[in-house]
Structures are given as structure tokens and as C-alpha cells.
Regions:
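Alpha/propeptide regions of enzymes that mature by internal proteolysis
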Residues: 1-297
Length: 297
């Protein structure tokens, strides 16, 4: 059964997710506090008149810096004990997008994906060339080992193969532009060089001002094969709400590939939708008139 939270909104709006899956014991409170902080960071951009693109990047960067999420610092490790990160961003006005895959020494891959978008030469960069771009844009670079937390190392030593999660955000700004961003450390124990849906435009991330924006979380290979976010946005035209569109897309994923996942969406008017077919997915939403982020699960 799809589990969901929906939003009625017009004007600026923001939704942030911390990844669909099964939470480990003791993580619930920390993960919900994390998505709430991320939503407040993104909302601060929107409240100051900033762009949807800047808002989703700021929100996701907060989660990349939080070791309770599988993105940036604290990500799961590859089969040989390294961190390799994927991320993507997209803005819906000009359909500009940027993505990076299998990067190893960048603190915030979502900001590196933004650099790819800003340069506009490519949509996706993988590995060492992406690190070169980070140097050119003055982005914070760290030793690869600095991204590994003791908890992640212990899980790797136990060969804990729990599915990797993903973080992401969608937003609409006061000018009516929409954007989405997604970031992940990928699957625990993955082979080096594996790139998942978080770096694939149309699968894990998409934005179009005429329709809306979405960020997905779940099994990357299945999400890529379906093109999950594009499926969800295609359903928006006929759906009664963004949540209904998200549910419909997740039903397609389940029916065709037997996979469970989660989605956050905004339509072109800033009405938010949240749905999941997994045991948990912490989400925080922010809308005009609300004093603080609303947690949805």
C-alpha cells in the first residue's frame, strides 16, 4: 500500500526526503530532526526570494553533512571500503541539469552537480573529471577517508548489505520556477564505478516548470529502468493531486519490477505530494503560512 502525505499549496513550497527503506534502531528521531533542519535551510532561501534551484541544493547539502543519511559524510561503503557519491540537480525553466557519479573526495556532491549545470557543457560527469571540476569551482574537497564514519566502517566490516538510501528535495519558488536535487552514497557493498538513479536525469531527478519536479529514492537499477520521476510527472497531468501521481508511479514500479521506493513531487503550482511503498521515508515539507517544517511519514 502506498503511504503518503499530501500538501495543498500555492506559491513557494518545499519538500525534503531522507531516503526510503527500513530504518535501523534508534535512527528515527535523528533522521526526522535532520530532514526538518534541511527543510528550514531550503525554506530560508525561498523566504528571502531565492530560487527553487538554490533552495533544493541548500536543503540537500544539509543532509550530505549529516552522518545519519546515506549521502556525503557517512555514506555506505563500496565492496573495497570506499565512499563513492552520486548526485544530480535540475531546474525546470530552461531544463538545465547537472549530475555527477562515483565521486570520492567532494564533501557536497550536490554542489558539484550544480557546477556541472552552471558550466552547461555536459549533463553527467563521472569520477576524476568531476573532481577536476570541483577544484575549478573552489568546492570543498576532502580526503576520501574523511567521508567514512566509524559506523559506516563497522557496517562494512560486518558486510551489512542493507539497501542504500537517498536524500533529495523539490521546490517551487515565488516566480513559479521548480527544481529538484538528489544525492546518495549508493548501495552498501557496491562495485566501484557503479552509478545509480540519483545521477540519472529522468530516473531519480527531474524538473519542468510546465509540469512539476520530483526526487526519487529506492533501488537504483529498477528506478532507472522505469524512469520513475518522469513516469510520476507524466501522471501529474491526469492525477487529482501530486500525491496521487506519486502513488501511480510507484504502482507501476511495483507491478513491472516488483520494487518498492519513495517519491516527493511538486506540481507546477507548488502543491506537494509524498508517497512510499517502503517501511519508512522521513520527509519534511514547508509551505507559505507555516511556522515550521511539517514532518510526514
Amino acid at each position: 500500500m502506498a503511504r503518503n502525505g499530501s500538501a495543498r499549496s500555492d506559491g513557494p513550497a518545499l519538500a525534503v526526503h531522507g531516503g526510503a527503506g527500513r530504518e535501523r534502531g534508534g535512527e528515527r528521531a535523528a533522521r526526522r530532526a535532520g530532514v526538518a533542519r534541511a527543510a528550514e535551510a531550503g525554506w530560508g532561501v525561498l523566504a528571502a526570494g531565492g530560487s527553487a534551484l538554490d533552495a533544493v541544493i541548500e536543503a540537500v547539502a544539509v543532509l550530505e553533512n549529516d552522518p545519519h543519511f546515506n549521502a556525503g559524510f557517512g555514506s555506505v561503503l563500496t565492496e573495497d571500503g570506499r565512499v563513492e557519491l552520486d548526485a544530480s540537480v535540475m531546474e525546470g525553466t530552461g531544463l538545465r541539469a547537472g549530475a555527477v557519479g562515483a565521486v570520492t573526495s567532494v564533501a557536497n556532491p550536490v554542489r558539484l552537480a550544480r557546477a556541472v549545470l552552471d558550466e552547461g557543457r555536459e549533463v553527467l560527469l563521472v569520477g576524476a573529471p568531476a573532481a577536476t571540476l570541483a577544484r575549478r569551482h573552489g568546492l570543498q574537497r576532502v580526503a576520501a577517508e574523511a567521508l567514512v564514519t566509524p559506523a559506516a566502517r563497522r557496517r562494512w566490516e560486518r558486510r551489512d548489505e542493507a539497501p542504500g538510501e537517498t536524500v533529495g528535495a523539490v521546490a517551487r519558488d515565488a516566480r513559479g520556477a521548480v527544481a529538484a536535487a538528489t544525492s546518495t552514497g549508493g548501495l552498501a557493498g557496491k562495485r566501484r564505478g557503479r552509478v545509480g538513479d540519483s545521477a540519472v536525469i529522468g530516473a531519480g531527478t527531474y524538473a519542468d516548470d510546465r509540469v512539476g519536479a520530483g526526487s526519487a529514492t529506492g533501488p537504483g537499477e529498477a528506478i532507472i529502468r522505469i524512469g520513475l520521476v518522469r513516469v510520476a510527472l507524466d501522471h501529474l497531468a491526469a492525477a487529482r493531486s501530486a500525491t496521487a501521481a506519486a502513488r501511480s508511479a510507484l504502482a507501476v514500479l511495483q507491478a513491472r519490477l516488483g520494487a518498492s521506493a519513495g517519491l516527493v513531487l511538486t506540481d507546477a503550482r507548488g502543491r506537494l505530494g509524498v508517497a512510499r511503498t517502503t517501511p519508512s521515508m522521513p520527509v519534511a515539507v514547508r509551505r507559505v503560512g507555516a511556522a515550521r517544517a511539517l514532518l510526514v511519514d
